[in-house]
Amino acid sequence: MENAELEVLEITRQMLEAMYTGDPEVHRKHSAADMSSYEWYIAPQRIDGLEFHLKLIEGGGNGTAGRLDILTPRVQLYGDTAIVNYTLLKTSFGAESQPPQFATMNETRVFVKIEGIWQMVHLHKSPTK
């Protein structure tokens, strides 16, 4: 992978972790204010604006995850535009006697380099089943 591909993939990883740690700063830095998203488990319509995601993160984000893995990532670069798609594997651990719980979803993120900083302008999530 090229340096720009690795950079966008690392930003993606940081954004995912921030959703589970309740840290909105990564999203403030790497999301355009007018970003859009489709998140099937939240709403059947498009969600517009970064503010929704910041409030979600500040309110506890996506709960807790014992582990997040980005499976089969692909980064496509077109000048100052990057498209990242992958399958997210979320592993949650319960009590010691309980087996781990797994959840997967497919995600696509579109980034544009604005004033030297990669910013997400669109996010699309879909179920894997």
Where are these predicted regions, by residue range?
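A solvent-exposed, acidic/Ser-Thr-rich amphipathic alpha-helical stretch
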Residues: 3-6, 24-78, 87, 101-102
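Residue-level signal for short segments within beta-strands and strand-turn junctions
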Residues: 39, 92, 112-113
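Short beta-strand edge/turn micro-motifs at domain boundaries
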Residues: 83, 104-129
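Generic short beta-strand segments
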Residues: 86-93
